[in-house]
Amino acid sequence: MSEYTVQDYKFGQPRWCPGCGDHSFLGALHKAMSEIGIAPHNIAVISGIGCSSRLPYYMNTYGFHTIHGRAAAIATGAKVANPDLTIWQISGDGDGLAIGGNHFIHAVRRNIDLNMILLNNRIYGLTKGQYSPTSARGFVSKSSPYGTVEDPFRPAELCFGARGRFFARCVATDMSAAVGCLKAAAQHKGASVVEVLQNCVIFNNGTHDSIYTKEGRAKNAIYLEHGKPMIFGENREYGLMQEGFGLKVVKIGENGITEQDILVHDAHCKDTTLHLKLALMEGPDFPIALGVIRDVEDVTYNDAVHAQVEEVKGQKKYHSFTELLETNETWEIK
């Protein structure tokens, strides 16, 4: 049992709009950290720019509110320099996938041991309502008054395309599931991407309405758990089966279908094919997948860098710059 409580991680008074999903997520992060039990002074929360990027101010840990889109780059440097530090990187969909998109995919590709949280409300909130890389085609905003004419990024596709080893998804208002995803991300060694679906009550209210309430999730979402059959519905009456190279929804009890026929979720499968199909499911034909979709272990960038440094040091006469300066072959200029 952890020696820390939620209060040990709280700091300051959050200054977000009433009803903003950031409030719910902050509570989930405080709770997850208290259950994980890592001391606050061993944690750094690093963010970019945006509404969600104010989060480090409300954490009683080390924090760094950095520059637009560069949270992943700065978090990378911090982790490589101090591998014992637990790092939570916080970005919004605009900050993380537009100006920060390149940093995002390369941090994932390199498999740096970061907990990368993407708070996705499908809008630029801090700059007052422009469409973001995750806004739907046709979305009307201040920067697209006649509707966007482009398709959005889907974070799971970016993650898997960058050889991502961990991807989870939760809803900001679902405290229990969000805490579970955050704890799983922290336990995973490597780049852990958690997409948090949240609401912006001012500029994009209702963007995740189909699953934002408990009743909505019962009808329109599926909670994935490793080793368990993929069953969903208000009465757990539906399941997922494979059909060719795709998936199909079936009703348990019809046409002789039983729970034994339902696909069992394997989050640890190295192949991304099924994980991607699950992550891209959308209504009304399919439920939206929540929970840990992918969790595969692999060597991390930071471990590989430090192993390489030690190997090279073993082959050299001098093991550090300080040792080099302290040899007899130095002089003083007066």
What positions do the PLM features span?
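Conserved thiamine diphosphate
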Residues: E3, D84, S132-A185
